[in-house]
Swiss-Prot record:
Listed name of the protein: PAXIP1-associated glutamate-rich protein 1
Chain residue ranges for the region called Disordered: 1-108, 126-253
Organism, as annotated: Rattus norvegicus (Rat)
Pfam family, one: PAXIP1_C
Residues annotated with Phosphothreonine modification: T137
């Protein structure tokens, strides 16, 4: 009985450390799992970062390619523009070159003949068509010449005599100049035979004179242009004009 109990106690004592060892092993396994999980998470993060960096690098590469394409297009356009702007024409020799590409050369017999002519005559006759000459192009007037001509034209205009017109008038009648008198009349004819012209200054002066005469008649009661050459006697009464007519008798002007 004691052995059994003792054996049981031994088994119980041995079972207790086994259970503790299991807990320890399970704890170690859990730690191992945690340890193994840590590097996997970091590796996944590293992979994601690597993928992101690769994508960014790809984007930068695509941007660089686009920039290169744009610069190449601009350079091509500049080259095309320069090719259109700059044009170097070929020389006459290049235009006149034959199909074989060799320049023109006279035959040896012609060269010999020309040298013989030079030796005998000393000069060669120029065989060329002389074109007719045209007159030289007149030079354009400069600003100084134009400015010199303008004062002369103004002086000529100022020197021209002023011709009277119907609208040129003064307060007093203007006596006609000798240049305006008609000289085609005969010596025996009177001055009244001249053609009379209506002028505005003459009309205005006549109106002014008539107005003065009417004022004089109304103020004094006498007509200055009476038919009688003798003056009125002091005993005779002054002439009065009626209300209907201001001029009772005809006047001579």
């Amino acid at each position: 009985m004691s052995l059994a109990l003792g054996h049981g106690t031994i088994a119980g004592s041995t079972a207790a450390p086994l259970s503790e060892e299991g807990e320890v092993t399970s704890g170690l396994q859990a730690l191992a799992v945690e340890d193994t999980g840590g590097p996997s998470v970091s590796a996944s993060k590293a992979e994601e970062e690597g993928k992101g960096s690769q994508e960014e690098a790809g984007r930068e590469a695509s941007r660089a390619e686009e920039a290169l394409e744009a610069s190449s297009a601009v350079s091509d356009e500049r080259a095309e523009g320069e090719s259109e702007d700059w044009c170097v024409p070929c020389s006459d020799e290049e235009v006149e070159l034959p199909a074989n590409g060799q320049s023109w050369m006279p035959p040896p017999s012609e060269i010999q003949r020309l040298y013989e002519l030079l030796a005998t005559q000393g000069t060669l006759e120029l065989q060329a068509e002389i074109l007719p000459r045209r007159p030289p192009t007149p030079e354009a007037q400069s600003e100084e010449e134009r400015s010199d001509e303008e004062p002369e034209a103004k002086e000529e205009e100022e020197e021209k005599p002023h011709m009277p017109t119907e609208f040129d008038f003064d307060d007093e009648p203007v006596t006609p100049k000798d240049s305006l008198i008609d000289r085609r009349r005969t010596p025996g004819s009177s001055a009244r035979s001249q053609k009379r012209e209506a002028r505005l200054d003459k009309v205005l002066s006549d109106m002014k004179r008539h107005k003065k005469l009417e004022e004089q008649i109304l103020r004094t009661g006498r007509d200055l242009f009476s038919l009688d050459s003798e003056g009125p006697s002091p005993a005779s009464p002054p002439l009065r004009s009626s209300g209907n007519s201001l001029f009772p008798r005809q006047r001579k002007y």
